[in-house]
Amino acid sequence: MGRVIRGQRKGAGSVFRAHVKHRKGAARLRAVDFAERHGYIKGIVKDIIHDPGRGAPLAKVVFRDPYRFKKRTELFIAAEGIHTGQFVYCGKKAQLNIGNVLPVGTMPEGTIVCCLEEKPGDRGKLARASGNYATVISHNPETKKTRVKLPSGSKKVISSANRAVVGVVAGGGRIDKPILKAGRAYHKYKAKRNCWPRVRGVAMNPVEHPFGGGNHQHIGKPSTIRRDAPAGRKVGLIAARRTGRLRGTKTVQEKEN
């Protein structure tokens, strides 16, 4: 019998867990309240910080609590173009400016947004990675729904009450710069999680991986595997509908969507 393979050991956690000790906190929008639903609330960008393990910078935005005599600091995903000292307005009656938070139903068609809510009040789930954005396509006032185009290119119909930050997530073009050397990859994944360096299965011994062994590096069996395979065998293309390169032009695929 072979050893417990890497994919099985990952499920147990331990050294494979994400390195969250140095992270700055959850980046999300304000909890929706009366001030945002019926008017707007003003905050100020105090600082723009780096969050280890995240490509996009974060903005520390300070708001006056509308219900208690104190200040609240929120961590927003920074939109490209915002700066320290800038005023940020959140609410239904806020203006359409970079960094402001508005319901998508109040935005004109074609608006570029980021940190978009999937459901009303979930504080931002979509288009959050560096350089990403979603586009408001159309509104349906009767059903109070809005159609948006996501970074993947897929279209999604969401509630018009969902909020979003106006603009593009900062840090765009990050992946255009090549890593070039192993040392940079080492530090990148040291901040994220233990998944580097990744040894190929065909380079292992037969006891360590189903694709290991042989006089030359080859899989030696179909790389597709059924869904209900045991954990030690479930490697490769799991329950693949199709394999191989995608044929056809992108425009045709977009029309199908």
From Swiss-Prot:
SUPFAM superfamilies: Nucleic acid-binding proteins, Translation proteins SH3-like domain. Pfam families: Ribosomal_L2 (PF00181), Ribosomal_L2_C (PF03947). It is found in: Cytoplasm. Residues 207-232 are annotated as: Disordered. GO terms for cellular component: cytoplasm; cytosol; cytosolic large ribosomal subunit; cytosolic ribosome; focal adhesion; membrane; nucleoplasm; postsynapse. Keywords: Cytoplasm, Hydroxylation, Isopeptide bond, Ribonucleoprotein, Ribosomal protein, RNA-binding, rRNA-binding, Ubl conjugation. Hydroxylated on His-216 by RIOX1. The modification is impaired by hypoxia. One of its GO terms (biological process) is translation. There is a cross-link at residues 42, 149, 234, 250 (Glycyl lysine isopeptide (Lys-Gly) (interchain with G-Cter in SUMO2)). The modification (3S)-3-hydroxyhistidine is found at residue 216. GO terms for molecular function: RNA binding; rRNA binding; structural constituent of ribosome. This protein can be partially incorporated into E.coli polysomes in vivo, indicating it can replace the endogenous protein. Component of the large ribosomal subunit. The ribosome is a large ribonucleoprotein complex responsible for the synthesis of proteins in the cell. Component of the large ribosomal subunit. Interacts with CRY1. Belongs to the universal ribosomal protein uL2 family. This is Large ribosomal subunit protein uL2. It comes from Homo sapiens. The gene is RPL8.
